[in-house]
Amino acid sequence: MNKNFIIAGAVILVLGLAIAIGVTLSSEPVAAGLPEGETTVTGDLLPEFAGENDDNIALGLAAPIFSAPNENSEIVSLEKNGNAKALLFLAHGCGYCQKEVPVVQGFIDSVGVPPGVDVIAIATSIERGRENYPPQKWLADEGWSETQLYDLDREIGNAYGLSASPYWVFLDKDLNVVARRTGNLPADMVGALLIQLGNQ
């Protein structure tokens, strides 16, 4: 057999394998290891969080309605059920978020969630390779006991005006904005806000 033919055949075989491997790698899901499911958002978007002036901008606005997967890939929707909502947006690679979760969970463990309030953690700004990936393992390790949803493409965060994490959005039972806050909140402030929310 011609030596050049053998070499050419080997080159073609190697190239074929390389292409096959490349296709396999490039087609690997970006969200591998994360909960699966479609995220949807409807309604008008909230303006970006405006710091100290935010209450003058966002107070009373109707919140966008969303659906997203929980840690078990079950789709959960924000809906009116007679309870107010405390939405906590978290980024798994954010040091401030890593401090906030045990503070909030500590309050829940010691005092409990006030009647008439649903606390929902929303993992957003999810990036493979950053600390605490995948975020559902991080929240499990922290003992998070409340609803947790996964904003895989940051659609919900963008709709709610997220500019920094951790980011709280408090909604009344009609799903209108009561307050928005960002940064680490101490346990007593978290408790006061949740109690105030439940009393509305």
Give residue spans per PLM region.
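A short beta-strand-turn-helix
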Residues: 57-58, 65-86
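Short, small/polar residue-rich loop motifs at catalytic or cofactor-binding pockets
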Residues: 62, 83, 163-165
